[in-house]
C-alpha cells in the first residue's frame, strides 16, 4: 500500500538493498518532507516505477525528440483512458485520480518537456456508481513547462473501446504519434464496415507488458553495472507535487503555480 512506500524504501535501503518502488512515493507531500533527510541520505540505488518511460512506443517517441526529429516540442497531448474504474473501496484509499492514475502522465510530461511551472485541472464526475468516493472519475489537465511548451492530459476511468493509451508530440519541425496497441493487426472491410479493427487491449498488464519487462531489466542492469537509475526519487517527488497541484486546481478552479 502507498502509505508504506517510504517506510519500506528506507528499511530496504538501510539493509543495503537496491529498491524499485511503485508510484506514488506517498499520498501526501507532508510524508515526503518528514522523511526528506533520510531519503537524501540513501546510498543504494532507488528507482521509481514509472513504467511508461520504458514502453517501446513512448520511449521511441522520446528518443526521436532527443534526436531533434521534430525540433523543440511546442505541444504534448497524453490520452489515457481505462476500460473500467477500480473498485470504489480502492479509490477511497488510493489518494484519488491525480495521485493514482494521472501521476504516470505527470511523469511522462516531465520526461518529454522538463520541469513544469503551472497546472490547471478540471475534474469530472461522470459515473454515478463512483459518486460516493469523493473523487473524480475523469479529468483534463493542462501543464505549462518552463520551456513554454504546453501539455494536455486527458484521463477517464471508463472507456468502452478498451485501454486507450495514446501520445502526440508536436514540434516546430514535425510531430510524433504513439498509437494504441491491439491484439492483432488485422483490419476488416466489407459491406457493413470499413477498416474495422480489433479492440484495444483491455488490461494494463497486457498493454504495458513490454514496459514492465524493460523497466525491470533497466533496474537490474543499473544495479549490476553501478550506473545511475532512472526514474529517481526526485522524479517520484516531482510527480507527487504535480498531483497535489492538480487536485488543488480541480477543487478550486484556479491555476496553480508549482512550488520550486
Task: For every predicted segment, state its role.
Residues 21, 46-48, 153, 178:
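Hydrophobic residues in well-ordered beta-strands that form the structural core
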Residues 45, 52-132, 253:
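Predominantly a Rossmann-like dinucleotide-binding segment in NAD(P)-dependent oxidoreductases
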